[in-house]
Amino acid sequence: MLSEFENGAPVQQFVSRFRSYSSKFLFFPCLIMSLVFMQWLISIGPYSGYNTPPMYGDFEAQRHWMELTLHTPVSQWYFRDLQWWGLDYPPLTAYVSWFFGIIGHYFFNPEWFADVTSRGFESLELKLFMRSTVIASHLLILVPPLMFYSKWWSRRIPNFVDRNASLIMVLFQPALLLIDHGHFQYNCVMLGLVMYAIANLLKNQYVAATFFFCLALTFKQMALYFAPPIFFYLLGTCVKPKIRFSRFILLSVTVVFTFSLILFPWIYMDYKTLLPQILHRVFPFARGLWEDKVANFWCTLNTVFKIREVFTLHQLQVISLIFTLISILPSCVILFLYPRKRLLALGFASASWGFFLFSFQVHEKSVLLPLLPTSILLCHGNITTKPWIALANNLAVFSLWPLLKKDGLGLQYFTLVLMWNWIGDMVVFSKNVLFRFIQLSFYVGMIVILGIDLFIPPPSRYPDLWVILNVTLSFAGFFTIYLWTLGRLLHISSKLSTDLRNKKEA
């Protein structure tokens, strides 16, 4: 298998310094220290809502949830002060917020999370504490399963240098680092739990995989992007090569147990009143088809056809559901028919891209979900996939530019994007002439739009024109990536089908 880094990229040169037997044990400590150093460099910059009253931003939302869970009875977590960053994530997020709030309140400074009076509180010490919680979460929850995934696929990339060069590029993907450690969120927790589920699928530990994925769902509802592919994969393992009804029952019990465990306080107190409120807060359909400008089908279509003026909210929900089901159906069917480990990442990627492009209530930051399974394809050691994986990462961080620019993270954006592409020699193109033209066109488009956005003010009549150009190009790119993941999934599954048919005939 050819390496993605056959031309000696800087990341490969870095890893090669640890290839000797006496130095290999130093590689992972140095890698972790480098990752933490990069996270802190990004964290020095501003965050979402910095010094922008009255509502501030995501930083204040996360801080407020620590305050809320610390001073409010559990039964009121999803009822209190809904106008001031009311809790709108599932209970595991609330538990984590409570845990960090306890640490900050009792071990550092109670003023940070004082009831009501701490709203909008900003200080260097609080920023340091909050940033530290994200970095710790990233290292403890996301990094270990990514390392395991890379190691599991190492049999296809036996070379120490090439294998770990791929791991570095996955760990340093710009979009996630900029959103979690710049803008400020805890996406690394949800993505880490999803990766733990995938890691356990690789080990055939289906109950553990189900448990971790349920935890991901109870941390952030956006993990639903992965629910159909993991369901059909697990269902496939229950019926192929023979029907295992006991496994299906065991997995079903695991789902019920995990959700019951997480929701137990609300079930115990008053499930008839409290559970509907949690669902209402977690799935706010009344907010509309999308928020802000997001590079999905509906927001892009709205620039030329005002769909929200033609269809009712309920009609849009039904239409988006139909489009989403159509987009994810092929990958789900393939994972059911061929529950093979080599199809996992591609199946997850294809289905989650379909969700991002066509589902209801999409945020621009949701691109991090399909980007994860797309990025870990680097660990599979196939040189032909690198141009598409690199394009997906560059398009993803490009689509986040309006948000990061608003946050004042321009320096971090350009530094990290340029560094990531340079150390991994990521701006490469497919040998296929058509694919090469498509990839080159998207890179040129991104450079042109960024240049216009930086140096030319938009027309006063169309203040969002540059953002709309960004959204349109990003959607076209994401749809292309979706088609690529689906096409590759179909190609590999057809080869599996042929191999199985030949074995039966033999």
UniProtKB/Swiss-Prot annotation:
Primary subcellular site in the record, as a coarse category: endoplasmic reticulum
Lumenal face of the membrane: 46-132, 185-210, 269-317, 364-382, 430-436, 486-506
TM helices/strands, residue ranges: 25-45, 133-153, 164-184, 211-231, 248-268, 318-338, 343-363, 383-403, 409-429, 437-457, 465-485
Pathway annotation: Protein modification; protein glycosylation
Membrane topology per record: Multi-pass membrane protein
Pfam families given in the database record: Alg6_Alg8 (PF03155)
Gene Ontology process terms (BP): dolichol-linked oligosaccharide biosynthetic process; protein N-linked glycosylation via asparagine
Family classification: Belongs to the ALG6/ALG8 glucosyltransferase family.
Function comment: Probable dolichyl pyrophosphate Man9GlcNAc2 alpha-1,3-glucosyltransferase that operates in the biosynthetic pathway of dolichol-linked oligosaccharides, the glycan precursors employed in protein asparagine (N)-glycosylation. The assembly of dolichol-linked oligosaccharides begins on the cytosolic side of the endoplasmic reticulum membrane and finishes in its lumen. The sequential addition of sugars to dolichol pyrophosphate produces dolichol-linked oligosaccharides containing fourteen sugars, including two GlcNAcs, nine mannoses and three glucoses.
Protein name per Swiss-Prot or TrEMBL: Probable dolichyl pyrophosphate Man9GlcNAc2 alpha-1,3-glucosyltransferase
